[in-house]
Design a protein with these regions (language model features):
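Alpha-helical transmembrane segments and immediately membrane-proximal extracytoplasmic
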Residues: 2-420, 425-543
Length: 543
């Protein structure tokens, strides 16, 4: 028993470091795609700003993890009813099963360059692992084991997260269309007149996002300031809008500098919020397991304080992953290409569903054109029609990058303020896709491939929950039934899976085409093995 506990604790801490590495590699798409896609700065500068945001967010994190993960499972089911003491082996099985499954799942998505939600994955893994432990350690069979899950909150979390996908896509498409309608593609001409308004709105959205999502739950802001921000969002937005709008007015003839500043601020802001709030998704299970073993009388229904040294170590690992992982580039490349301007080389092939949706869109567009006055259609086309692409054009322009960041930040802030469950990955990805549609960068020639790629990512999100819950169920079952040997089997399965994915996709340290470079990506199915046999003439992104 003691040997199994010791081995399990060591394994879960080691897996936490791997989980940080693969988690950042996948979530990097949240705060890198806009800056990289618009080439707002050099790659080193963008990475440095994102790394600074991550490091600052890690150091100022509150370090609290809700052990029961917002009511996913009933923690009292894993305590001794007579003494109230934690059943250590059961808790270790739950959290080790979660960590083992999470590492494999995130690395699988990273290998094929697909973004997924770490929030959905960890919630689903907690569901699967807790059911497995309850099944094998309590009487009553599967029916009784299922009662360990609090189905109402779990279904609410899933529903809220997937509804945010639709909201992010439609709102970003509408806002981008309106922004382009006002600014046109001749931004140097229109920005001096109305650019200060968009500057103020963008800065206000990002500042509010930093304050509310990034800092209100940290140690940096005094409680009274955090309370004021939560209670007075309109005042906070107004206080941010006025000076930002003034800066935009004073710099109205330097639109590139203003837009780049917004993009880089948004990049650092998303990095800060990610580390400050989502960091504990990766190290929380390890901290909770260590507390259950080492701290007498710990209550699973409470919050677990994370030591400062653990936060610092986690921040270092996250920054290292951001700089070193080529899989992070692969995931970012997927989103940048799907949202890029012009006939960009895509990773995905057409399929029947994408073709049917495109044909349906053609029919709807014909109806819209039939009821739209000709003069209005001509005027809208003159203001929103994209110009012919150039050879050195970035995947998307600076204005669209600011829309991506501002819409994502605003939606995340609103959801957080209203305590709505959401996924930053889903919102940032769908905001970028919606903005691309609203900016009219899709063409009928490549619409099916773009839509097939979006459907592939959406399909991956749908199966994330199933894969995460199933994987955690299997891992936790191995640990509960096998004891020390079960721990070895679970860790061995993770090692074999990681090695296998590295062999399939090539070394993680192998340099691939950077996002926006224009070089064609490797085939998404077996990216390295068939790459040489499928090479085509390089096409610059955005052409």
């Amino acid at each position: 028993m003691e040997a199994a506990v010791t081995i399990g604790l060591v394994a879960i801490i080691g897996l936490a470091l791997f989980d940080l590495w693969v988690g950042v590699a996948n979530d990097a798409v949240n705060f890198l795609n806009s800056a990289i896609g618009s080439r707002a700065a050099s790659r080193r500068a963008i990475m440095a700003i994102a790394a600074g945001g991550i490091a600052f967010g890690a150091l100022t994190s509150s370090g609290l993890m809700e052990v029961a993960r917002k009511g996913v499972f009933d923690p009292d089911r894993f305590t001794d009813p007579e003494t109230g003491a934690v059943v250590v082996l059961s808790i270790l099985a739950v959290y080790l099963g979660v960590m083992a499954a999470d590492v494999l799942l995130l690395d699988l998505f990273n290998t094929f360059g697909l973004p997924t939600s770490t929030t959905v994955s960890i919630i689903s893994e907690l569901v699967g692992a807790s059911i497995a432990v309850a099944l094998w350690t309590t009487p009553g069979g599967l029916g009784q084991a299922l009662t360990v899950i609090q189905t109402g909150p779990v279904l609410g979390i899933y529903t809220g997260i997937f509804l945010s996908v639709l909201v992010a896509f439609t709102s970003a498409a509408l806002i981008m269309f309106l922004v382009r309608l006002f600014f046109t593609h001749d931004v140097p001409r229109t920005f001096p007149r109305i650019g200060w308004i968009w500057t103020g709105l963008s800065f206000a959205a990002l500042i509010y996002f930093v304050l509310f999502k990034g800092l209100t739950n940290t140690r940096l802001l005094p409680p009274e300031v955090a309370e004021f921000i939560s209670a007075n969002p309109a005042k906070v937005v107004a206080l941010a809008f006025l000076p930002a709008g003034l800066v935009g007015l004073l710099m109205r003839h330097e639109h590139e500098k203003v837009l780049k500043l917004i993009i880089l601020l948004g990049t650092g802001s998303l990095g800060l919020a990610f580390a400050g709030n989502d960091l504990v998704n990766f190290i929380g299970p390890s901290v909770a397991a260590a507390q259950a073993v080492l701290v007498e009388g710990i209550r699973l229904s409470g919050s677990v304080p994370t030591p400062t040294w653990a936060l610092l170590l986690a921040g270092v690992v996250m920054v290292a992953s951001l700089w070193r992982s080529k899989k992070a580039r692969r995931v970012t490349d997927t989103e940048v290409r799907l949202a890029a301007h012009g006939a960009t080389e895509q990773r995905f092939r057409e399929n029947g569903l994408a073709r049917a949706l495109v044909n349906w869109a053609r029919a709807v567009l014909k109806v819209v054109k039939a009821i739209t006055p000709g003069w209005l259609e001509d005027r809208v086309n003159r203001r929103t029609e994209p110009p012919p692409p150039t050879a050195d054009q970035p995947p998307y322009d600076l204005l669209r990058a600011t829309v991506n960041l501002s819409v994502a930040a605003l939606l995340i802030s609103i959801g957080t303020a209203n305590k709505l469950p959401l996924s930053t990955t889903y919102i940032t990805f769908m905001a970028a896709m919606g903005a691309a549609l609203g900016d009219r960068v899709w063409r009928w020639q490549d619409a099916e491939k773009r839509l097939a790629g979006i459907l592939m990512v959406l399909g991956g999100w749908l199966i994330t929950g199933f894969l995460a819950a199933s994987g955690a169920f299997v891992m936790a079952s191995l640990i509960v039934l096998g004891g020390s040997w079960g721990v070895f089997l679970a860790v061995g399965a993770v090692a074999v899976g990681l090695i296998r994915m590295k062999l399939v996709n090539g070394s993680d340290d192998e340099e691939g085409p950077p996002p926006g470079s224009g070089r064609p990506p490797m085939d998404r199915r077996t990216p390295r093995r068939w790459a040489n046999s499928r090479r085509s003439t390089p096409t610059r992104a955005g052409v």
